[in-house]
C-alpha cells in the first residue's frame, strides 16, 4: 500500500521541508538536515512532531503521512526504534484527544509496512490501544484467524504473543465485544504450556470470572481443559467453575453460603448466578428426562409455582432448551436440550446417532435401487 507523501521531492529535501514546517510551528529544531543521515533527521522530526498535532487535521495528516513515507524507505534495522517512538507519541498524545486522526495515521503506517516485518507488532498494539480508548475497536482488524497469522508471520516471542492477546482481550472487553473477547482469552490461555502455566494465574482467574459473568455464556467445560485453569485446582475459583460446569443449583447455594465474601470479591452478583444456575440445572434435567413435572422443577430450581411458566419461557429464549408446557398435566415436555458437558459419553451418542442415520440412508438407497431395477 502506498502512503501519500508530504511533497513530491527527494527524501533529503522532504526532511528539510518538514524541519522548516515544524520550526514555523514553534518546535525547537534546526532547519538544516543532520549530517547523520535520514534516520537521524527522522528521529529529531518525530521528537518535535507534537507541535503539528495541534494544527488543522488536513495539515496534520499530510505532515504525518510524510513522516510515515520516509520511515517506510529506511532500512529495517533503522526503522524499529523510530517506529516505536512515533507509536508512543500517537498513543499518548494529549490524553486521548483526536483519536480518529491517530487511528488513521497508525493504520497508514501499519498497512504501508511489509506484511512480515516484526515491528508491525508495535504498530498493531498501538492501534489496539487507541481504538480501545475511543470505543472504536470495530474499525481495526481483530479476527482471531488473522491475528494468529500475524503472530506466526512476525515470529513473536511467547512473551510478546501473550502481551498482544492480553491487550486485544482487554480492548474487546472495554468495547463490550464479549463474545470476541472470550475467544481471545481462551486463545491466550491455550497458548500456555505445562512449564509456564503457573504464570497465567491472573489471566485464568479473569477468564473464569468473565465467563461466569457473561449473561450469554452457559457452557464452560472447555475452560477446565486449559492448562492455566487446571493449575488453579484446589482453589475456590476452580471449585466455583466446576459447579457451573456440571453441578446443580443446590451445590451453588451451599457454596455461596460458605463463601459469600469470595463471590462478592469477584464482582459476581448472587441473583445473576442463581438465574444462570437455575437454567444450567434445568438443562441437565432436560437431558435426562423428556418430561419434568412442575413439582420437580419447583424443588430443584427453588422457584414458586407461579414462576414455572415464566422460567420455561426464558429458558427457551436462550435456545439451550426446546420444550413446551403442558398446563393440564402440570409438566414440561422436552424436545431437545444442550449438554452442559461434551465428553466421551456424548461423543459415543453422537456416533451412534450418525451411524443409525447412515444405516437408514443405505436402506433407502437400496430400496430405491431395487425399485429402479423392476
Swiss-Prot record:
Pfam families: eIF3m_C_helix, PCI. GO terms for molecular function: translation initiation factor activity; translation initiation factor binding. It comes from the Eukaryota. InterPro entries: ARM-type_fold, COPS7/eIF3m, eIF3m, eIF3m_C_helix, PCI_dom, WH_DNA-bd_sf. Component of the eukaryotic translation initiation factor 3 (eIF-3) complex, which is required for several steps in the initiation of protein synthesis. The eIF-3 complex associates with the 40S ribosome and facilitates the recruitment of eIF-1, eIF-1A, eIF-2:GTP:methionyl-tRNAi and eIF-5 to form the 43S pre-initiation complex (43S PIC). The eIF-3 complex stimulates mRNA recruitment to the 43S PIC and scanning of the mRNA for AUG recognition. The modification N6-acetyllysine is found at residue 254. Component of the eukaryotic translation initiation factor 3 (eIF-3) complex, which is composed of 13 subunits: EIF3A, EIF3B, EIF3C, EIF3D, EIF3E, EIF3F, EIF3G, EIF3H, EIF3I, EIF3J, EIF3K, EIF3L and EIF3M. The eIF-3 complex appears to include 3 stable modules: module A is composed of EIF3A, EIF3B, EIF3G and EIF3I; module B is composed of EIF3F, EIF3H, and EIF3M; and module C is composed of EIF3C, EIF3D, EIF3E, EIF3K and EIF3L. EIF3C of module C binds EIF3B of module A and EIF3H of module B, thereby linking the three modules. EIF3J is a labile subunit that binds to the eIF-3 complex via EIF3B. GO terms for cellular component: eukaryotic 43S preinitiation complex; eukaryotic 48S preinitiation complex; eukaryotic translation initiation factor 3 complex, eIF3m. It comes from Mus musculus. Residues 180-339 form the PCI domain. Keywords: Acetylation, Cytoplasm, Initiation factor, Phosphoprotein, Protein biosynthesis. The keyword Flavoprotein does not apply. Coiled coil: none annotated. This is Eukaryotic translation initiation factor 3 subunit M. The modification Phosphoserine is found at residues 2, 152, 367. PROSITE patterns: PCI (PS50250).
Amino acid at each position: 500500500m502506498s502512503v501519500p507523501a508530504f511533497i513530491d521531492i527527494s527524501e533529503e529535501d522532504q526532511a528539510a521541508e518538514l524541519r522548516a514546517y515544524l520550526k514555523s510551528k514553534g518546535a525547537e529544531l534546526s532547519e538544516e538536515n543532520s549530517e547523520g543521515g535520514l534516520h537521524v533527521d527522522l528521529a529529531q522530526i518525530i521528537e518535535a512532531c507534537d507541535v503539528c498535532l495541534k494544527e488543522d487535521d488536513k495539515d496534520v495528516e499530510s505532515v504525518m503521512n510524510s513522516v510515515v513515507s520516509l520511515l517506510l524507505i529506511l532500512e529495517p534495522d533503522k526503522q524499529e526504534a523510530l517506529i516505536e517512538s512515533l507509536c508512543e507519541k500517537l498513543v499518548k498524545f494529549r490524553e486521548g484527544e483526536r483519536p480518529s486522526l491517530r487511528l488513521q495515521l497508525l493504520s497508514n503506517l501499519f498497512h504501508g509496512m511489509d506484511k512480515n516485518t516484526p515491528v508491525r507488532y508495535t504498530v498493531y498494539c498501538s492501534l489496539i490501544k487507541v481504538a480501545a480508548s475511543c470505543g472504536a475497536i470495530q474499525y481495526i482488524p481483530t479476527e482471531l484467524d488473522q491475528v494468529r497469522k500475524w503472530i506466526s508471520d512476525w515470529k513473536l516471542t511467547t512473551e510478546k504473543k501473550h502481551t498482544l492477546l492480553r491487550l486485544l482481550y482487554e480492548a474487546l472487553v472495554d468495547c463490550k465485544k464479549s463474545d470476541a473477547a472470550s475467544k481471545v482469552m481462551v486463545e491466550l490461555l491455550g497458548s500456555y504450556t505445562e512449564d509456564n502455566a503457573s504464570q497465567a494465574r491472573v489471566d485464568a482467574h479473569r477468564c473464569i470470572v468473565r465467563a461466569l459473568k457473561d449473561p450469554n455464556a452457559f457452557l464452560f467445560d472447555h475452560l477446565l481443559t486449559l492448562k492455566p485453569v487446571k493449575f488453579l485446582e484446589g482453589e475456590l475459583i476452580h471449585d466455583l467453575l466446576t459447579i457451573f460446569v456440571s453441578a446443580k443449583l443446590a451445590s451453588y447455594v451451599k457454596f455461596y453460603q460458605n463463601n459469600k465474601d469470595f463471590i462478592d470479591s469477584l464482582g459476581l452478583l448472587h441473583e445473576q448466578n442463581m438465574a444462570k444456575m437455575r437454567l444450567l440445572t434445568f438443562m441437565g434435567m432436560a437431558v435426562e428426562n423428556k418430561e419434568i413435572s412442575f413439582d420437580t422443577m419447583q424443588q430443584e430450581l427453588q422457584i414458586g409455582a407461579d414462576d414455572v411458566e415464566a422460567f420455561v419461557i426464558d429458558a427457551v429464549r436462550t435456545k439451550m432448551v426446546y420444550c413446551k408446557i403442558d398446563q393440564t398435566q402440570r409438566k414440561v415436555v422436552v424436545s431437545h436440550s444442550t449438554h452442559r458437558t461434551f465428553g466421551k459419553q456424548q461423543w459415543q451418542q453422537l456416533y451412534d446417532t450418525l451411524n443409525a442415520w447412515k444405516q437408514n440412508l443405505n436402506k433407502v438407497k437400496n430400496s430405491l435401487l431395487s425399485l429402479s431395477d423392476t
